[in-house]
Amino acid sequence: MVIEPLEGARKIITNVEAKEEMLSILDTIRNSSDIKGILMLYTEKYHGNIEYKQYLLESLESNIHSDKGRYTTTFRSAVNQFLKIIRNLSIPIAAGINGDLGPNDFGLILAYDLRIATEKAYFYNPNLELGYPPSALLSFYLSRSLGPAKATEILMTKSKISSREAFDLGLITEIVSEQELEERCLEKLRELSTIPSHALIETRRILQPSLDEISKHLDTSLEGFLRCLYKRQN
């Protein structure tokens, strides 16, 4: 099944309706015996640092003018719900990227089984340029994937990464043409669908971090993020 998440993780994590809609779709897929794999197809363009900064500031406003820590709680809850479903899927899940991914989506796809991109794909990490710490999801999964030293180097020196650079780092499984992308992703999903479901689930549990570990990182990261936002407001 192909899903094209408009506005990606950012909307799913911060918008309750969008989150519930995505969780409902994934729940339906999970309960279907006819669907053999999930392709999350990313085709949107990055709208620039000004638009992204506005999103960060709106996040701060929602935290200030609502119950204390609401944004932090909402973010952590949405991430945990989404990752829990991914971990327990009995079918493979892959990302097909033919556009731009912001920091949260970049981090999130590292939890998928496969990531296939085109030469047009770019991954953005503008937080430090804007005066904020890295995305909680991106900093966590990048560190897990590459180790703390390499992750630190990338987060501090790279605000934009090409698909070729991501492939060389081992973050992308394969690079294909735009015309080949969807079919290649579906082909790889069909290959992985031959793995018994219980073995697939247990493999993820062995290789993926625990949700408690992720939650602790999210709390620490978001506290630092909010401190920076408050300081820039004052």
Stretches found by the model and what they are:
Residues 4, 8, 39, 215, ...:
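Intrinsically disordered, low-complexity segments enriched in small/flexible residues
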Residues 1-2, 157-193, 199-213, 222, ...:
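Amphipathic alpha-helical segments at domain termini/boundaries
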Residues 40, 108-110, 166, 185:
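Hydrophobic/aromatic residues within transmembrane alpha-helices
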Residues 34, 42-78:
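Glycine- (often His-adjacent) and acidic-residue-rich active-site loop
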Residues 139-149:
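Hydrophobic, secondary-structure "cap" segments at the distal end of domains
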Residues 1-43:
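Conserved CoA-thioester-binding segment of acyl-CoA-metabolizing enzymes
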Residues 78-130:
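Glycine-rich beta-to-alpha active-site loop
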